[in-house]
Every structure is written in C-alpha cells, then in structure tokens.
Amino acid sequence: MNSYLISSSKKSSGKTILSIGICSAIHSFKKVVAPFKKGPDYIDPLWLSKASSKNCYNLDFYNMTNSEIKNLYSRNILNADVSIVEGNKGLFDGISADGSDSNAALSKLLKLEVIL
C-alpha cells in the first residue's frame, strides 16, 4: 500500500486543500483512501472524511503514545489502497526541541513517504 504524509516548510501553505484534493481524486477512481490528520484538529478531519468517504482519525503526539499512534494507524489502513496523513505546520516544526513531535517524526514512526 502507498502511504504518504502531506507536509510543507511552514504553516498555512495549502496542505489541507492538497490533502482534500488527493483524497477526492483517489476516491473518484474507486480506490479506498484512509485519511488521517496529525494533531488535535477537528475541522480538517471533517473535510478529509468528506473527500474520501471514510472516517479520518487524528494522530496526536500529545494525547497518544507512539504505540497508540501506530496501532490506530495500522488498524485503519487494513482495507485501504492508499493512506494520506495531513501534517500540521512545517515538516520539522513542533514544541519538543528534539523534534520528536514533528511531521518528520510521524513520517519516520509510520514509515510514510513525504510529499512536501
């Protein structure tokens, strides 16, 4: 299965519109898309769910352990052709000085290819 993280160099760079477009395009070809959103966002997942006709799940380093993130992700990609994870802010942005809560860290944890 193809698995991607949509990121950018900074916030407000069009990640959401690109993620929605990708999910909608893949879904239009009768493929199953598993959408995810990094962080505690509640609006973007609604758009991603609408575009893919699948529930979108949040992957949040602040409310979940790495193991919980991996388990939630793994359970929800089982019947998918493609997974799309929309990042938040920039690729290396986060609160932790070591970058352990960044989009880059999430892509490494879940072995996702990054679309920047």
Where are these predicted regions, by residue range?
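ATP-dependent carboxylate-amine ligase catalytic core
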Residues: N2-I17, C23-L110
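Conserved beta-strand/loop subsegment of P-loop NTPase cores
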Residues: K111-L116
